C-alpha cells in the first residue's frame, strides 16, 4: 500500500515535471530545416538559431521588447593581409520566401565573391595580419524572430556572422518643415 502511494506520487511528479519543463522547450521549433531547399552546388548552409530569451541589458535606455530588435547578418572571409587595401566584391545578400513555409525565409549570396585589393609594393619585412573582410558596405538587417532559424546559403569559402541590434526606448520628434 505504501509503495503504491509512493509510485503514484513519483509518477505524478514526473508528469508535472514533463509538462512544466519539457513543454516550454517545444514551444519554439528548433532547427527544423525540412521546408528549406538544399543549397546549390558550391554553396554552404549556415544556420543561426536565436535564443528565445536574452540576458537583460545593463542599459535602461534600450528596449527589452524583441519586436524592436534586429539581427545583422555579416557575410565575409578571413584572410591574411599585407599593406594593401582589401575588400570583397560580389552581389550582396538577397532574401527568398518560398511556398508553404509560413514566415520562413532563405538568405543567400548569388554569384561569385572575389577579394579585391590595391597592388602596392609592400615592405618585405612587413608581417601579414589576419582580418575578416565583410561583403557589402551596408548592414543587412532582418527581424528578430526566435521561432524560426535564420538560414543563409553562401559560396564556399565565406562565413556568416551575426550581431544583435536593439532600439532605444526614447523616441525623438522630427522637425516639420
From Swiss-Prot:
Q: Where in the cell is it found?
A: Periplasm
Q: Where is the signal peptide?
A: 1-23
Site described as Reactive bond, located at 119-120
Gene Ontology MF annotations: serine-type endopeptidase inhibitor activity
Q: Report the Pfam families cross-referenced here.
A: Ecotin
- Check the record and name the InterPro entries matching this protein: Ecotin_sf (IPR036198), Prot_inh_ecotin (IPR005658), Prot_inh_ecotin_gammaproteobac (IPR023084)
Q: Which residues form a coiled coil?
A: none
Q: Main site of residence? A: periplasm
Domain of life, per UniProt, equals: Bacteria
**What SUPFAM superfamilies does the record tag this protein with?**
Ecotin, trypsin inhibitor
Q: Where are the transmembrane segments?
A: none
One Gene Ontology CC term in the entry: periplasmic space
Which key words tag this protein in UniProt?
Disulfide bond, Periplasm, Protease inhibitor, Serine protease inhibitor, Signal
Taken from the UniProt record, the cysteine pairs bridged by disulfide bonds within this chain are: 83-122
The family classification in the record reads: Belongs to the protease inhibitor I11 (ecotin) family.
Q: State how it assembles.
A: Homodimer.
Reported function? General inhibitor of family S1 serine proteases.
Designated name of the protein: Ecotin
Organism taxonomic ancestry: Bacteria, Bacillati, Cyanobacteriota, Cyanophyceae, Synechococcales
Gene name of the record: eco
